[in-house]
Amino acid sequence: MPPRQLSQTTPSCAVVPRKRRLVAALIAVPGLMPALAHAQLVGEAAQPQPIDAPWGMQLAPQLEERPLQPGQKPATFVLGDTTSGTTDQDMAAKGSAEVRRNTVVIKADALHYDQDTDMADAYGSVHVVNNGNSFVGPEAHMRVDSSEGFMTAPKYHFNVTGGSGSAERVDLLDNERSVFTKGTYTACACADDPAWYIKGSEFDFDTGADEGVAHNGVLFFQGFPVFASPWLSFPLSGERRSGVLPPTFSLSSSNGFELSVPYYFNIAPNRDLTLTPRLISKRGVQLQSTFRYLSPTYSGSITGEFLPDDHLTKTNRYALYIQHNQNFGNGFGGYIYYNKVSDNTYPEDLSSSVNQFMNGTQLLYQQEAGLTYNNGPWSVLAREQHWQTLTPSVAPYGREPQLNVKYAKYNVGGFDYGAEADYSNFRITTADMTQGQRVMFNPYLSYSVVGPGYFVTPKVQWHFASYNLNHLSDADVAAGTPKNFTESIPTLTFDTGLVFDRSVRIFGQDYIQTLEPRLYYVYTPYRNQQSAPLFDTADSDFGLAEIFTPNTFVGNDRIADANRLTAALTTRFIDAATGDERARFVIAQQYYFQDQRVTLQSTQTSAQATHSDLIAGASLKLGAGFASETAFQYNADNNQLVKTSVGFGFSPATGKVINVAYRYTRANTTLDNTPINQVLISGQWPLAHRVYGVGRFNYDLGGHRIVDGLVGLQYDADCWTLGAGIQRYANGLNTSGQNQSSTRFLAQLTFKGLSSVDNGLMTAFRSSVAGYTPLPPPPPPESRFTNYE
């Protein structure tokens, strides 16, 4: 309503022209800014610092906000170039007019304030600041204390959350809630011409709950509508909120065009649910659902996927993934991992988008539940383990059930000792395979002598195993093998080394160079173990990590006989100023005093050699982000390079990385006579302003084919990002037994300030490129004191 005409008869209320004048403090001033601070300093930092002893003035370390005392009311201030009014009734101001109370500021060309109704009417270039939210328009009417009122044709900005927009009208319900009619919303900094915005018939905003709701909302990007919904909920900042997430698109040779539209339910701070309809042009509509939960004592997730009547296979297809971890307290815990798919080709055809760009196809699905106990030296595991195996993978043995107990004590008078006891009932889904029970007990005792520049560690351990087989297969055990038998095998190791160091200066830089010779001796007598099936045992790899272990097998069904000595020499170059290791060189070889007779299969011949292949490795870290790692295995008797890997990495700055690697393994029987001869190149590099390229290229030189390849682009704008990638990947074998490949495409558009969800593209970039740096997140929202008025 228009301002009331004020009487000019009272001298104290006469119109007095001036440039700026504080007219009245209508109510006593108990405190200026009550109860607003989100964070407070504590301790000595929060104490005022004296700066003027005679006057007792102090420098406050932060804004202090004093709550009102009981019975006190906040002060109201009216300012203007010219003012008129009646004390304790109303006041009118013109020219740079203002009304202030607590966190509410109303500015206008002219305004009228009625104390009885607490109503402020503002006209002309109105600017309302309410609890950090800013509204600009031609006219506003609101109750100052309750922050209730309306404004016509407003432009608004939420200072703390960063959102802004415009509308035909806004109704302010209080200092946090507001309703906009026929408005827009964006989180872009350039509100006049935003890259994306939501347009709706009505918006409900609650800055306290950090939530916005658009009715009949349409999402525009670069001026074009990309999504519409009769009800669209979204967060006003980076906090989680229920609502529709941005749709994702992909294209593959096996599925055609795909469109996924996730809907996110923020059930509670520690629980959420995501429902995702997934349209697959060649197969139909799949529904995906993921429920996550978290508490101080348990956490987990349940994911289900269902595709009714696949257009290509004419079957219903599904997948179920359950993961649960439980902490019962006092060292007790439990877990459940259950994963199942409907058919053998499900992971190839319908792998979820999050896993789409991961290399390879999952063929083993774990189904396991267990109880654990960990307390001091004790570690106990009781579990039931099963596997779903997809062709052409070979099924592993399950443990149905297993009880494993470990005990370990360290440095008890210089001694380390412990034991592992295990009972397992091994079962397998493959027909006509040996099954049965195994009881194992492995105690050990070692004593370490460590001094300046040397160490000596002798160790003795024993392997006891008892087998009770309930089914024998002619395919994996020799004829006449008993069903019940035991094994007892001792092992003695002796590990010793020296460490020398000296100061050196290389290219003007001071380093500490070390020289570290090491000897490792192993003795294990021969025991015939061909009666034992291979439940969990395979050949160990041969490298720098395995050369100092007593057994050449992994698992407990084979203990290799040994009488060998491993000799190694390591030298390091350490930056004398920082302690950073800049270079390392290692060379090692094993020397055999007798031939190893224990083999995995009875048909294999035992190794006959006086020494092993030579193993060497080197790692370098140079300036300007350059690093290199090299390792090779060389057979001096045959003058053959058995295995090598050479890798280089260059990362001069964030978002810039190039990796080059070469891998080679000579053909041998343990690798099914299949050599490895591959070149791997990957990297991330800025191509132009805000544009980054991401790529991975793995090429098989022997087979003249691409093992896997990925090419992607990322564009990082102020309030949106766009990523796209295309991948060529190995996808199993065809009916002729030859390798087959597939191609797929995935795009991801992210609106900063509206949503942040990865549909699998960022995961692919991160896993494909070592040293990959994600695009920077949007800047944090401004403080409510920014642009303070």
UniProtKB/Swiss-Prot annotation:
Keywords: Cell outer membrane, Membrane, Signal
Superkingdom per UniProt: Bacteria
The keyword Signal is annotated on this UniProt entry: yes
Pfam family, one: LptD
One Gene Ontology biological process: lipopolysaccharide transport
PANTHER family reported in the protein's UniProt record: LPS-ASSEMBLY PROTEIN (PTHR30189), LPS-ASSEMBLY PROTEIN LPTD (PTHR30189:SF1)
Role this protein plays: Together with LptE, is involved in the assembly of lipopolysaccharide (LPS) at the surface of the outer membrane.
Protein family: Belongs to the LptD family.
Name of the molecule in the record: LPS-assembly protein LptD
Organism listed in the record: Paraburkholderia xenovorans (strain LB400)
Gene: lptD
